[in-house]
Amino acid sequence: MKTIIINGVQFNTDEDTTILKFARDNNIDISALCFLNNCNNDINKCEICTVEVEGTGLVTACDTLIEDGMIINTNSDAVNEKIKSRISQLLDIHEFKCGPCNRRENCEFLKLVIKYKARASKPFLPKDKTEYVDERSKSLTVDRTKCLLCGRCVNACGKNTETYAMKFLNKNGKTIIGAEDEKCFDDTNCLLCGQCIIACPVAALSEKSHMDRVKNALNAPEKHVIVAMAPSVRASIGELFNMGFGVDVTGKIYTALRQLGFDKIFDINFGADMTIMEEATELVQRIENNGPFPMFTSCCPGWVRQAENYYPELLNNLSSAKSPQQIFGTASKTYYPSISGLDPKNVFTVTVMPCTSKKFEADRPQMEKDGLRDIDAVITTRELAKMIKDAKIPFAKLEDSEADPAMGEYSGAGAIFGATGGVMEAALRSAKDFAENAELEDIEYKQVRGLNGIKEAEVEINNNKYNVAVINGASNLFKFMKSGMINEKQYHFIEVMACHGGCVNGGGQPHVNPKDLEKVDIKKVRASVLYNQDEHLSKRKSHENTALVKMYQNYFGKPGEGRAHEILHFKYKK
């Protein structure tokens, strides 16, 4: 048993933990910047978490273990002076222009500057930002005038993806962050997943914005602008309007999109149901033809880049069904014009995504037909929130409305795509019905749900048993492959999501304060919104979506055949 005193209060504990964690667990506030829970920074130390230990002096709380007899002061004059001095030093390398900054509402550094009344000794105000800003990537933007060199992006990349694509670099004697040899991230092993952006406490890292594309289209009279949001957006955007975590705001988003001026409001959940129609059909065909196995999902562009960069031998095993975003985009330029009488050239398709890698996917050269892009612009959850705020739309007070029916209806299977295991479960619901030519009532595959890194299950289809696996996060895919598990048994179907927790934890989602992350399992809470929708929808299988059935009957024909196979599939190659 250890006895310690913090700010005059005695605690008894058996824990072996750091001063920072123990203090926060006991509601004692200690400021921090470089520290992220479960992602400790062993590269750069910001020293913002400095505390004073009697007999020892000033120490950093994030990496100093508590010891019996410690007397700790978190708010002494020496502590406050040290922290203020460090913040002032950081201000000397940080462009302190908060007005136009996209992080001004949730900038962790700004809060520290205000709290400690810090000032720069020599303000950093570059006249020409060209050498500091890297916008070459289709997904990510780096603004080094904002970078504090805290190392959170480097550590988050290493822990969450194990690609170590984000690095500290030496440029003319100065330390910067970037890709190896200052290459464009797209030309490296980077997954473009955006976990580095989520980790960044300031605006040094952000998504490549498509907002100007969208605004220009909305202001072009000849353009018919349609929009569709991904499943996870409805589970998170409320956080950016002070509505708390885990609030379903589907109807409010539809209303806000109409007020922004979009001509038609559809839903990517419809695209998810389309993907399942094709993917489940493909799985059944492989079962009937005895392979090739395993079939991997292909709807996560971060995972696709991981396969391309590290395991190109697996590309032939990826499902050829387009992702919900791309398959929706294809339908928006073919089926939708056929029922609306519009010229496909005038249809401008926008998606709202929780993912930065979706921007890269949408801009792949092959993702077009007859010169028309499947998707014209991709905005993240954060970008949509900014558009709503810029338009002064009172989001939290909006009445709910519905999506437009032609491509806005969706099933519970489409809704759960945003959670790890959701694609697997949705596909199995339809594949089992297709293979057994029945409408089965037992539709929940809870063994593939949850946040474990590698989940396995055995499913029965037509009295035969099939092995499936769900890989939760890019780092766990590396573990799965390096362990040899893929060769230990015959897997038939494997889902992979690059981001831990799935799309609900994507790189385009709202920033969450690290202190909140220590208290709230954000992945679980956001996913609960999707599972709740699934549970309460009358149609819980993709092939029960009446608007989808109508589309196949009147335009695409049978899933996996003819026109459907020709334009709703894309084969990734080495």
UniProtKB/Swiss-Prot annotation:
Positions contributing to [4Fe-4S] cluster 4 binding: C300, C355, C499, C503
Annotated [4Fe-4S] cluster 2 binding sites: C147, C150, C153, C200
InterPro entries (alphabetical): 2Fe-2S_ferredoxin-like_sf, 2Fe-2S_ferredoxin-type, 4Fe4S_Fe-S-bd, 4Fe4S_Fe_S_CS, Cytosolic_Fe-S_CAF, Fe_hydrogenase, Fe_hydrogenase_lsu_C, Fe_hydrogenase_ssu
Binding site for [2Fe-2S] cluster: C34, C46, C49, C62
Binding sites annotated in the UniProt record for [4Fe-4S] cluster 1: H94, C98, C101, C107
NCBIfam families (alphabetical): FeFe_hydrog_A (TIGR02512), Hydr_FeFe_Clost (NF040762)
Organism: Clostridium pasteurianum
Protein name: Iron hydrogenase 1
The protein's assembly and partners: Monomer.
Keyword hit for Iron-sulfur: yes
Reaction catalysis annotation: H2 + 2 oxidized [2Fe-2S]-[ferredoxin] = 2 reduced [2Fe-2S]-[ferredoxin] + 2 H(+)
PROSITE patterns, per database record: 2FE2S_FER_2, 4FE4S_FER_1, 4FE4S_FER_2, 4FE4S_HC3
Record Gene3D superfamilies: 3.10.20.740, 3.30.70.20, 3.40.50.1780, Fe-only Hydrogenase (Larger Subunit), Chain L, domain 3, Iron hydrogenase, small subunit
Binding sites annotated in the UniProt record for [4Fe-4S] cluster 3: C157, C190, C193, C196
Cofactor: [2Fe-2S] cluster; [4Fe-4S] cluster; Fe(2+)
Domain 4Fe-4S His(Cys)3-ligated-type: residue ranges: 78-117
Domain spans labelled 2Fe-2S ferredoxin-type: 1-78
Record's keyword terms, sorted: 4Fe-4S, Iron, Iron-sulfur, Metal-binding, Oxidoreductase, Repeat
UniProt domain 4Fe-4S ferredoxin-type: residue ranges: 138-167, 181-210
Record EC number: 1.12.7.2
Molecular function (Gene Ontology), one example: ferredoxin hydrogenase activity
Positions annotated to bind Fe(2+): C503
Record note on cofactor: Binds 1 [2Fe-2S] cluster per subunit. Binds 4 [4Fe-4S] clusters per subunit.
Pfam families in the cross-refs: Fe_hyd_lg_C, Fe_hyd_SSU, Fe_hydrogense_Fe-S_bd, Fer2_4, Fer4_7
